[in-house]
């Protein structure tokens, strides 16, 4: 349980290390993260910090959310995200505070959550990496068919979770253990090694890695 940041994916590029290696990185814009609410064990039963980022037109904000933000004295943002934290961490924040990119350090491992790029309705080959059937030798119309999806009269049904064709992508997923290679405090940009889920401009959530790796 630790505080993170929300932002958007700018895109991918590369930087060069001191030894000349080309390092592929994803640029994340985590500017203007503002605290909208502080939750404490006394009032809410747990400790958490709620943040928002970016800007949103007032006409796009519903009355309940507008009232919530007005109470905190915070301008409407693009999204709200709550981070569970330790009880002692809550004391260091109050509504309206700005959380900067210096929350992270170079070399630190982070987990990045985003919405994967949607691929539409896809077959089992693309969606689940199934192999195709035989091209010939008696096969005529079943080249990319999934094959059998059940058994016999017993159980007489298709079990839930059976891998079949359907919507592929457009799901929330997390890439774990990405290394922070650069922290741009001036422009509030975070550069992490490798790719993160989602398309350019997509919302992302960055938090310290939950799994320690050597």
UniProtKB/Swiss-Prot annotation:
It holds the Pfam family Ribosomal_L3. Keywords: Methylation, Ribonucleoprotein, Ribosomal protein, RNA-binding, rRNA-binding. GO terms for biological process: translation. InterPro entries: Ribosomal_uL3, Ribosomal_uL3_bac/org-type, Ribosomal_uL3_CS, Transl_B-barrel_sf. SUPFAM superfamilies: Translation proteins. One of its GO terms (molecular function) is structural constituent of ribosome. GO terms for cellular component: cytosolic large ribosomal subunit. Methylated by PrmB. The keyword Protease does not apply. The modification N5-methylglutamine is found at residue 153. Transmembrane segments: none annotated. Part of the 50S ribosomal subunit. Forms a cluster with proteins L14 and L19. One of the primary rRNA binding proteins, it binds directly near the 3'-end of the 23S rRNA, where it nucleates assembly of the 50S subunit. Belongs to the universal ribosomal protein uL3 family. This is Large ribosomal subunit protein uL3. It comes from Aromatoleum aromaticum (strain DSM 19018 / LMG 30748 / EbN1) (Azoarcus sp. (strain EbN1)). The gene is rplC.
């Amino acid at each position: 349980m630790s505080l993170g940041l929300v932002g958007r994916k700018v895109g991918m590029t590369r930087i060069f290390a001191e030894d000349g290696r080309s390092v592929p990185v994803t640029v994340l814009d985590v500017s203007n993260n503002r605290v909208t609410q502080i939750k404490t064990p006394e009032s809410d039963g747990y400790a958490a910090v709620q943040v928002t980022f970016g800007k949103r037109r007032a006409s796009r904000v519903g009355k309940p959310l507008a009232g919530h933000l007005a109470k905190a004295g915070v301008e409407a943002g693009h999204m709200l995200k709550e981070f569970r934290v330790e009880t002692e961490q809550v004391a260091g924040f109050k509504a309206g505070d700005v959380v900067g990119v210096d929350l992270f350090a170079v070399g630190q491992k982070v987990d990045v959550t985003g919405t994967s790029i949607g691929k539409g309705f896809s077959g089992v080959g693309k969606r689940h990496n199934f192999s195709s059937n035989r091209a010939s030798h008696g096969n005529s119309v079943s080249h990319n068919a999934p094959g059998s999806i059940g058994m016999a009269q017993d159980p007489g049904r298709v079990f839930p979770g059976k891998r079949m064709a359907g919507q592929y992508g457009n799901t929330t997923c997390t890439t774990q253990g990405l290394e922070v290679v650069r922290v741009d405090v001036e422009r509030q940009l975070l550069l992490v090694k490798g790719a993160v889920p989602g398309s350019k401009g997509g919302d992302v959530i960055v938090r310290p890695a939950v799994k320690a790796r050597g």
